[in-house]
Amino acid sequence: MEAMTHAGQPNQRSIPHAIPVYFVLRENTFALDLVGPAEIFRCANRHLESEGKAPLFRMHFISAESSLTTSIGVGLTGFSALPESLPDDAMIVLVACTGSDDDFSSVAACETVAWLRRQVRPCHRLMTICTGAILAGHAGLLDGRQCTTHYAHYDRLRALAPRARTGRCPSSSGPVPARFEAAIPVPRWRRSAGWPSG
């Protein structure tokens, strides 16, 4: 039930603003990197809703392709095209892709890199998971940001983003739990000064 003002209108300050989270998907998306963080955001929303509160996250799954196959061979469809613009408070999640993290020659990969260059701005939050950082590096998004990647791709990342440093870029690599650890703190950022609370 919405809180009402004295004039009978919804009190906008009492209705939390759901943060738009955009998962950028590519061919051979590493399934765990997609499902793990998405489930954390979903569970956070479900917990809040069980307490009668509004959800914190509004997830969007986007791609330059109309369909794709994940790392485990399961096909994905039904996601949205890359949007023409992103809201100022958006979070963009870049996940790893098995066997294609160093290949950006396909039409879809080039479109994805070009879209990231056009759309991602300093006001946005960027989360890279494992070799999702390589995609961010290709798009020139890591200058002035903190990042890491799988050790086998570390030198390539340094070459792509020589000016990367401490910033607002949660990034995970290494063991399986790291995928989840990168997403777990995100609900707490909802209270930070950097994101609006309503």
Predicted regions: what they are:
Residues 136-151, 179-181:
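Short beta-strand and adjoining strand-loop segment in the mid-core
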Residues 1-126, 136-138, 193, 197:
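Extended, subdomain-level signal for the structured scaffold at the beginning of enzyme domains
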Residues 143-171:
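A conserved active-site-flanking secondary-structure segment within enzyme catalytic domains
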Residues 174-198:
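Conserved anion/nucleotide-ligand pocket segment
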Residues 134-140, 173-174, 189:
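Acidic/polar active-site rim loop that often engages polyanionic ligands
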Residues 126-127, 148, 167, 180:
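Structural detector of well-ordered beta-strand residues that form the stable sheet scaffold
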Residues 113, 150-154, 189-193:
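Hydrophobic, well-ordered secondary-structure segments
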